[in-house]
Regions:
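Multi-pass membrane proteins that catalyze or facilitate reactions on polyprenyl-/lipid-phosphate substrates
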Residues: 1-157
Length: 157
């Protein structure tokens, strides 16, 4: 299979796994290894980032009406220093707060992500561990969370 066809397959893998409770990044590392593809570009962090940028573009486009509501609401809350008013102000800031842990981990673990976390064996083990954690959370966790139940500490968690 040529590199272009492999890239198409990788794009499909990214599209299918991004919205499931599995690691799309992990699958982007596992699939070439299982398929025996050794193209350095397809196995690169740069290619993985490009696929994720494509996913981001698709999300921004699909949810554009929500973003057009939430961004001005979040900015208005910042300007007025108040979450009072419509629920969009609060939701915009809950989303912003929920991104903080990922941002911090990304900054702190950048070097590891670029090197060690791209090793196939480690990725396979972490996918199994992540699956076990999701299974336990599904078995023991609450099944229902309404928007009114969301708090800033829960957004951070």
């Amino acid at each position: 299979m040529d590199t272009f066809a492999q890239a198409i397959v990788m794009g499909i893998v990214q599209g299918l796994t991004e919205f499931l409770p599995v690691s799309s990044s992990g699958h982007l590392i596992i699939v070439p290894a299982l398929a025996g593809w050794d193209d350095p570009f397809l196995n690169s962090l740069a290619f993985s980032v490009m696929l994720h940028i494509g996913t981001l573009a698709a999300l921004l486009l699909y949810f554009q009406s929500d973003w057009r509501r939430l961004i001005p609401a979040g900015l208005a809350a910042l300007r007025d220093r108040s979450l009072d008013g419509d629920g969009d102000r609060r939701l915009a800031w809950l989303i912003a707060v929920a991104t903080i842990p990922a941002l911090m981990f990304g900054l702190l673990l950048n070097d590891l992500v670029e090197t060690r976390f791209r090793e196939v064996g480690l990725v396979a083990v972490m996918l199994v561990v992540g699956g076990a954690i999701l299974w336990l959370a599904d078995r023991r966790g609450s099944r229902r969370l309404l928007e009114v139940d969301l708090t800033f500490p829960k957004a951070l968690a």
